[in-house]
Every structure is written in structure tokens, then in C-alpha cells.
């Protein structure tokens, strides 16, 4: 989640991400990491480096060649500025991957006011979560094919819901009465998601619509699990309970007490095979994974647990993650 609300927790989030990357690299698990954003379209464009992408947001070149050329009525609307930015990959050499992680760390530090400039073409933006879920379906299929995987896990790390989605709709122009393609706000309770011959309905709100999108994407990818890691801001526990955990706890206070005791809560749903909710105040990791390359997976898991020995929330995340990849 490369959104503005992540600014204050991006550094600790990066530490968690790097731990997962190091773990996957040690046991030779292929991975791709993407930042979803609507303010990175200028990456690769022939414009000055010190130009903010929003300075050219209405430029016609935004439409080509990076977005769909044909807009069909009834399809979900994907704005031209949306991007899935590939920030880390297991196909990179070790020194290149280390350099990528260093650049990400410096970017996160710069967002907090460090004494150097951040990359202006990769600033924080909104939260195009629904668009990212749609895109990750194709990206996951591609990874499964190229890496010849039998099982795949998609981990979505965010601190909140995505912004309101829209759909393509033919509309009469106000000026000349000509019918043109526009977009209109989407009502989840009136919307049917179709994937081939399958339909997904029943969403009553935005969060449920997002979950239906996950179900739709999973329906096309066998042996694929979705893991949602939700970083809770102060007071965000009630919202998480209302949207996702009502069927798992009798009262909010029950979930709150478990989170205070363990540092995190874990639930299983039809859409996300595992939901992990963590308070941002407990999201912290300082130690590195100490293990020699080439050792067996059992010892890797032991080293990973040792690294997080005194970190309650980290221990739970590691434990649940190992269960998922077993």
C-alpha cells in the first residue's frame, strides 16, 4: 500500500517486508513485490526528474501506452494513473536486490523528513486497492507459469480500505447531447462481478465488495491463498471488527482483549484465507535473520522464530505465515 496514510509507519512496514523477502530468498521461494499506487505513471517518462507526476496528470500521453485502450461499458473503471510498481523480485541478483531494498528504505526515510530528497516520481498516493486486486490476478498467473509453482500466496499489506470504485457507462454529453463513455460511482449492493461463467454478488458495502473481488480472482487461480495484513491505526480496531471480524467474535471487546494479549489477531474468511490485524504501535522489528544459505527449511524456520523471540506480534505473524506455506 503506497498511500499517504502509510507515511508514518512505512519504515517499520519495510522491516516486516524485508524479513519476508529474506526468508523467501533463504529457502528459494520465488517472489515478486509490487507497490500499488496512482502516482507513479511518470516513471520511465521523458520528463525532468524534479517534476511531480501530478504536474502532467491531464496530459494525453497518460492514456498511452500503459492503460487499456478499449473501455467497455459495465467494466470496472481503472484510472489512467494506476500502476503496480515492481519494487522487489527474486529474479534479481543478491547485490541488486540489496540495492533495491536500500533505495526503498531511503525513500521511506525521506518521506519522514530525512535530510535528502525522495524520488518525486514515486510519491505516496491514494489507495487503489480494488484495482490492485484485479491486477494481481494476472500477475499471479504469470508468476505461477514462469516459476512453475504448484502453490502460490498473495500477501496484501495495507492500513485501510481502498477508495470508492467506479464503472464505465455511456452517458449523454451535457453540451452536444452526444453519447460518450464516462464513469459512474459503483454501488456494491447493485453490482455483480462476473468471471467467465461465475458470478459474485451480495456485497453490502465497499469492504465486502473488495472481498468479493478477492473471491473472483481466486476462482481462476487454483492453490492460491490470499493473506491480508492490516495495520491498525489508533482506534482502527473497531473498524476492522465491523468490516471483517464480526462473525469471529461476539463483541469488539473480545477481539480487543485478544489483541492486547497477543499483539495481533488472526481470522480466516472465504475471501482472505488469513486476515492478520496488527496495531501499528507493535509493528517493529530490529533484528536480522541469521542463518547460513543452503540449510534445510526446518532450520530456517527455527532461525526465523529465534529472531522474533521477544516480539509478540512478530512471533504470531511468523507462526501463521509458516502454517500457510507448509
Which residues are covered by each model-predicted region?
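Acidic, glycine-rich A-domain
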Residues: 2-326
Amino acid at each position: 500500500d503506497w498511500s499517504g496514510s502509510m507515511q508514518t509507519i512505512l519504515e517499520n512496514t519495510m522491516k516486516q517486508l524485508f524479513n519476508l523477502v529474506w526468508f523467501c530468498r533463504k529457502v528459494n521461494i520465488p517472489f515478486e513485490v509490487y507497490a500499488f499506487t496512482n502516482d507513479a505513471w511518470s516513471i520511465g517518462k521523458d520528463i525532468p526528474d524534479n517534476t511531480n507526476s501530478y504536474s502532467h496528470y491531464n496530459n494525453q500521453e497518460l492514456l498511452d501506452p500503459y492503460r487499456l485502450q478499449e473501455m467497455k461499458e459495465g467494466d470496472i473503471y481503472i484510472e489512467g494513473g494506476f500502476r503496480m510498481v515492481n519494487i522487489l523480485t527474486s529474479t534479481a541478483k543478491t547485490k541488486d536486490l540489496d540495492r533495491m531494498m536500500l533505495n526503498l528504505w531511503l525513500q521511506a526515510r525521506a518521506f519522514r523528513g530525512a535530510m535528502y530528497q525522495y524520488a518525486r516520481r514515486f510519491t505516496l498516493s491514494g489507495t487503489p486497492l480494488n484495482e490492485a486486486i484485479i491486477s494481481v490476478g494476472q500477475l499471479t498467473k504469470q508468476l505461477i507459469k514462469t516459476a512453475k509453482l504448484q502453490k502460490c500466496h498473495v500477501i496484501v499489506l495495507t492500513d485501510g480500505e481502498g477508495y470508492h470504485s467506479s464503472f464505465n457507462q455511456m452517458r449523454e454529453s451535457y453540451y452536444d447531447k452526444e453519447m460518450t463513455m464516462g464513469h459512474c460511482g459503483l454501488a456494491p449492493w447493485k453490482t455483480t462481478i462476473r468471471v467467465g461463467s461465475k458470478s459474485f454478488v451480495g456485497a453490502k458495502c465497499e469492504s465486502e465488495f473488495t472481498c468479493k473481488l478477492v473471491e473472483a480472482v481466486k476462482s481462476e487461480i487454483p492453490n492460491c491463498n490470499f493473506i491480508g495484513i492490516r495495520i491498525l491505526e489508533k482506534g482502527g480496531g473497531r473498524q476492522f471488527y465491523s468490516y471483517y471480524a464480526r462473525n469471529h467474535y461476539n463483541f469488539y471487546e473480545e477481539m480487543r482483549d485478544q489483541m492486547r494479549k497477543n499483539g495481533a489477531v488472526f481470522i480466516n474468511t472465504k475471501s482472505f484465507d488469513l486476515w492478520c490485524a496488527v496495531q501499528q504501535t507493535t509493528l517493529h522489528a530490529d533484528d536480522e535473520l541469521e542463518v547460513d544459505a543452503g540449510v534445510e527449511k526446518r532450520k530456517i524456520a527455527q532461525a526465523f522464530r529465534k529472531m522474533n523471540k521477544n516480539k509478540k506480534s512478530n512471533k504470531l505473524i511468523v507462526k501463521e505465515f509458516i502454517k500457510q506455506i507448509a
